[in-house]
Amino acid sequence: SNERLKWESENDCNKIFEEWILDNKLSSKKKIENIRKEISNYVKEEKKLAWELYQRPIKEAKDDLISVFSKLEGLDVDIKKIFSTIDDTNISDIVKLCRRFIYDLPANDKKNKEILNNWKKKYSDILSDKYSSNLYSIDISKLSEKFILPNYLNDSDEVDGRIIIRDNFDKLLESNSRIFIFGEDVGVIGDVNQGLEGLQEKHGKERVFDTGIREATIVGQGIGMAMRGLRPIAEIQYLDYILYALQILSDDLATLTYRTLGGQKAPLIVRTRGHRLEGIWHSGSPLGGMLSFLRGIFILTPRNMTQAAGFYNSLLNLDQPAIVIEPLNGYRTKEKLPTNLGKFKTPIGKVEILKTGNDITLVSYGSTLNIVYEAAKKLKDYSIDCEVIDVQSLIPFDLEKDIVKSIIKTNRLVIVDEDVPGGGSSYILQELLKKQDIYQYLDSEPTLLTAKDHRPPYGSDGDYISKPSVEDVFEKVYSVMYESDPRKFKEI
C-alpha cells in the first residue's frame, strides 16, 4: 500500500543511520555524499566486470564452435544463420545448437560427426564439472578405504549385539576427542537399547548427552558441529522418526558440498535404528523415500551390530555425511565380541556374499538378511542352490559390481526388501539394470519381494503378514525355479 511504502521510506535504515551520524557529528554531509558516489561507482564497475567474466567462457565456446564449423569437410555452413536460431547467453545454448546440428548430418558423414561429438563432449563435461559435481564429499567411484576385518579369539565370548556397539563407541570416544554422541535418551540411560550404557558417566555430559525430542534440531546441531571440525554422531531414535528431520537432511546436509562446489563439508553421522520389530511406529523401513530425497548422504544398512560398528569406524576416516541404520532386532542377538573394537572397518560400497550358490541370486539388506538366509538353507533341501548377497551399502551401491558377477553365474535374481513396493527394491533393480547391465544375463524375469503397502501393525501376526517371511522368500524363489524347469520342480 502507499501507506506502507511511505513508512518504508521514512524508516529506511540507511537514511536513519545517516541522520544519526550527522546528529552525533561523526561526519559531514559532504563526506557522506562522496562515500555514496564512490560506492555507486564501485558497484557499477564490479557489475560490469562480473558480466564480462561470466560472458568470457560463453564467447570462448562460441568462437570454438565457429572454428569447428569452418573446418567441417564437404559442408557449406552458414554460421550467421545457425547462430541466429539460438539465444547464445549460456554455454548450454551453444551445446544445444551443436547437438541439433549433428541430428541433420548424413548417416555416413562419420568424420564430421566425430569432430562435432568431440566438441560436444568437451563442453558438456565443462558444464557437468561446474553444475553436476561434488554431490559427495569424496569421489565414490574411487572409494578405496581399506577395510579391516574384525579379529576374534578361538574362545571369543558371544555377547548381545548392543555390547559390541557400546564397547566400540567407548573405544572411539577414548581415541578421538572430537567425537560427540547425542540425541533423545542418549545420555543418562545410554539410549533406548543400551548401546551407550554408562558412556556419559565415563566420558562426561559434554561428550555424550541428551537432547530434546525434535529431530530437526538434533540434525541441525550435528550439521553445525560437523562444519566446525568436530565429528558428531547424532541419534534419531527410530528410523520412523527420520521423517521429522527429512527437510533439513535433504535441503541442508545432502546439498551442502554440492551447492558450495566442494567448498564446505559437514561429515555428520546420523545414527538410527529400524526395520522389522513389532509396532507401527517402530518397524519402519522407508528406504525408497530416503534414497530419493537424500542423494549426497551415504545410506548404510548393516545386518548386525558388528557390521554397524565397522561402518562407524570407517566413516570417521572420511569427510562424508552418512546415515547408519542399525537393525532393531539385533541388540539382543548374540554375536562374537571382536578383539579390535574401534579399529576394524566395514567396507563402504561393497556387497558381501553370505552364501555361495549356482541356481539363483538372492539380494537383500538389513534385518531381512536373516530371513533370506534361513530360507536359502531350507531351499537347499529342495535342490535349489541359492547365492545370498548382503548389499549392506545402498549409497554408494556395489561399486565393484559383484552382483552382476553372481547373476552371470546363476542367471536368476530375486530382490527381497521390507520397504513398500516400489521402494528400496526398485532402487536396487534400477542400479543393477542401468549400471551393471544384468538384463542380458537373465534367463528369468527379475523378481521383487517386498513388504505390503501399509505400515506393519503391532504384534507377531501383523509382522508376519506385512513383511517378507521365510515362507514368502521360499515360495517366491521356488516359483522362479519352477517356471524355469517345471519338469524338475513340482508345483507347490
Q: Can you describe what each PLM-predicted range is?
A:
Residues 1-321, 325, 328-492, ...:
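Thiamine diphosphate
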